Amino acid sequence: PVAISGTHGKTTTTSMLSHIALAADLDPTISVGGILKAIEGNIRVGGPDLFITEACEYTNSFLHFFPKIGIILNVDADHLDFFKDLDDIRNSFHLFAKLLPENGTLVINGDIDKIEEITSDLSCRVITFGKEASLNYSAANITYNEQGNASFDVVKDGQNVAHLALAVGGEHNVYNALAAIAVADILGVPAETIQTGLASFHGTDRRFEYKGEVGGVTIIDDYAHHPTEIAATLKSAAHYPHKKLWCIFQPHTYTRTKALFSEFAEALAHADHVILADIYAARETDTLGISSTQLADAVKEHGCDATYLPSFAAIEEFVTTHCQPGDLLITMGAGDVVTIGEDLLKA
């Protein structure tokens, strides 16, 4: 089995690797945490030789896997209702890496802070990818087309081995792709087939998903609910054609909003205008004294226009009167904020 872990990018990377495996006729069995159009769902039952699955760290659930190849995309502070702190999270990923057998391989982002705490005393082979040219797999000469989709050279152990073009946007997806490329390389998939697979991947539901256009305003929906994801999505949007960038953000859980409050404010300020909906409680009942009004004020301190509105109806009315033709509007969050864009398109 190939188990794909990390705080962010699991669904996208699992989907990218699945597309490559399908293009290579490897008949993969697939389990992905989002709807993947290529398999018309989130599960594909294929042959017994290759199982590609997402592996989530929440409640240490990924420690119940038996992977032969493991990916760690990144390690960030999240799920702090379960983990004590970042050291606790790092230790969890270390335990995940230790699951890999001697003849197994860990593919890990070499840019992870204190990576040695994860990779120490492992019996498996370790392969790195990331921004630094000294890593096993890195990307050079990254360029973006008018849709914000990246093309780049794949550099393996210092040698330029391929030039690839993605059909999804953002720098973060270059590194998600590198992880998928590294595993595909281990599986013996040729570069041309890797390119075919990646070119056929246009994203999963709720990951920078184009919803439509109304009154000249383009509406995108994105699942980002952690500051790192928010910043990555808004930076991706900067490469997308637009006049002003609007972000309607619905914070997800009081615990996360409180723990990462200043990081949220800084990340959201990458937009031109931010509209905050009420916090989506999910499994929580205690508000911890935190509110979207406070977050709006914190975003303003970064010099960004921010507004809190108490209902989806009020938000829909506000953007209808304030957005201009040519603007880009992103609904963002892991709750039900997607319905705002869908309502606007129905209007």
Name each model feature, range by range.
Residues T105-G110, C247-Q250, H270-A281:
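Short internal beta-strands
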Residues P1-G110, K114-C124, L178, A184, ...:
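Phosphate-binding loop of NTP-binding sites
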Residues A265-P325:
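C-terminal helical cap/extension that packs against the catalytic core
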Residues I69, Q147-G148, F152, K156-H273:
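Nucleotide phosphate-binding/pyrophosphate-handling subdomain across enzymes
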Residues S31-G34, S123-E146, A165-E171, Q195-A199, ...:
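Beta-strand->loop->alpha-helix junctions that form or flank phosphate-binding loops
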Residues A314-L345:
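A glycine-rich beta-strand to alpha-helix segment
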Residues D88, F96-G104, C124, A232-P241, ...:
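P-loop/Walker A phosphate-binding loop and immediately adjacent motor/lid segment at beta-alpha junctions
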